[in-house]
């Protein structure tokens, strides 16, 4: 049974990372239009600042949705495999695991626990990728705001 856990867990990690990479690619293209507007227009500092705040807020919300979809993939696997019976329990357990919180009060049976550990590992990877993406967006946005501030002063 342990090899089944590893096979499912690693497959789900690969799937959720593919989902994440796809989602981030779409987000990057969406954010590109914000960047072009910031670079191409002579916006005032206040308007540029509002655009960056709006873009970062939208990015945070869309990343939360993306992480929720990935948790739902794990939850569906738990239900399909019979590791958890209730879809509600499965999604609660999955969100809790993928966030590496581990305090939902739900437990997998002993022979499924490796999957829960692998989901937590997956969550660390996914949240790390998201953090790096947010950092990259800020690395691009911040210099644009600073240069705009210096032009306006």
Task: Identify what each model region corresponds to.
Residues 1-3, 45-53, 105-110:
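Helix-boundary and loop/linker segments of multi-pass membrane transporters
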Residues 64-93:
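Outer-pore turret/helix-boundary of cation channels
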Residues 1-12:
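Feature marks short, highly hydrophobic, charge-poor N-terminal signal-anchor/signal peptide-like helices
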Residues 22-44:
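Membrane-interface helix-loop junction between the first two transmembrane segments
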Residues 47-67:
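Interfacial helix-start motif at the membrane-water boundary
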Residues 37-51, 96-101:
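Perimembrane loop-to-helix junctions flanking transmembrane segments
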Residues 10-20, 89-147:
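Pore domain of cation channels
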Residues 16-24, 28, 66, 70, ...:
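Alpha-helical transmembrane segments of multipass membrane proteins
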């Amino acid at each position: 049974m342990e090899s089944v856990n590893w096979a499912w867990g690693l497959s789900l990690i690969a799937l959720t990372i593919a989902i994440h990479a796809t989602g981030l690619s779409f987000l990057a293209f969406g954010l590109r239009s914000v960047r072009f507007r910031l670079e191409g227009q002579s916006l005032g500092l206040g308007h540029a600042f509002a655009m960056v705040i709006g873009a970062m807020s939208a990015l945070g919300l869309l990343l939360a949705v993306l992480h929720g979809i990935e948790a739902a993939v794990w939850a569906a696997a738990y239900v399909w495999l019979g590791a958890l019976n209730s879809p509600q329990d499965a999604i609660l357990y999955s969100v809790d695991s993928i966030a590496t919180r581990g305090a939902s009060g739900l437990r997998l049976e002993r022979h499924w626990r490796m999957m829960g550990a692998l989901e937590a590992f997956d969550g660390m990877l996914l949240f790390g990728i998201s953090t790096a993406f947010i950092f990259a967006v800020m690395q691009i946005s911040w210099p644009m705001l600073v240069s705009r501030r210096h032009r306006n002063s």
